[in-house]
Amino acid sequence: MARYLGPKCRLSRREKTDLQLKSGIRAIDSKCNIERIPGMHWQRRGRTTDYGVQLRMKQMIKRYYDVLEKQFANYYKQADRLKGSTGDNLLKLLESRLDNVVYRMGFSATRAEARQLISHKAILVNGEVVNIPSYQVKPGDIIEVRSRAKGQLRIKGALELAQQRAPISWIEVDTKKMTGTFKEQPDVAELPAEFKVNLVVELYSK
């Protein structure tokens, strides 16, 4: 499946929550009514089945991390093989993607922008260029904006926007040096309360 290139607002409206797909310069509800799902007859939608609820949750999490269907399925398989809760493992794997970590550290305004920075070799991991957005960051890894990219206005702007977001316990960032440390495995308790990942587990367990 190709990556969605349409209006980001439409995806947030579909899931009835802010998926953080836009830069955050303006509040999402300033032009995007997330309470109204896309379509002309949105008020006539019928009762959702259990399968429909499970599918919607999978779509919400998949779109939040901006990954493709096949990628998401592979993450689930990997999470299911690991010890512990499959649902928690799934969220930890998604949170540990390099594009997500770059976004969390505030070096980009969106995950899509983070992927672009990584693909353009503007990000270092432990001093080495990594241009794979899906690269799994490990505890102790140091993420840094490459020297030649530190003057980019979009990165400086993203760092300013990041100050408005709630801090994340598993990362530590030096905004002046544009470096950050992935201190430990993500704490799923700090992720959006809307994520009922048990529904995704139920969906894939069928």
UniProtKB/Swiss-Prot annotation:
Name by which UniProt lists this protein: Small ribosomal subunit protein uS4
Keywords: Ribonucleoprotein, Ribosomal protein, RNA-binding, rRNA-binding
Assembly information from the UniProt record: Part of the 30S ribosomal subunit. Contacts protein S5. The interaction surface between S4 and S5 is involved in control of translational fidelity.
UniProt family annotation: Belongs to the universal ribosomal protein uS4 family.
PANTHER family reported in the protein's UniProt record: 30S 40S RIBOSOMAL PROTEIN (PTHR11831), SMALL RIBOSOMAL SUBUNIT PROTEIN US4M (PTHR11831:SF4)
InterPro entries reported in the protein's UniProt record: Ribosomal_uS4, Ribosomal_uS4_bac-type, Ribosomal_uS4_CS, Ribosomal_uS4_N, S4_RNA-bd, S4_RNA-bd_sf
Record organism: Coxiella burnetii (strain CbuK_Q154) (Coxiella burnetii (strain Q154))
Highest taxon, organism lineage: Bacteria
Function per UniProt: One of the primary rRNA binding proteins, it binds directly to 16S rRNA where it nucleates assembly of the body of the 30S subunit.
Domain S4 RNA-binding stretches: 96-158
UniProt KW Oxidoreductase keyword: no
GO biological process: ribosomal small subunit biogenesis; translation
Family matches, as SUPFAM superfamilies: Alpha-L RNA-binding motif (SSF55174)
Gene Ontology MF, one: rRNA binding
GO terms for cellular component: small ribosomal subunit
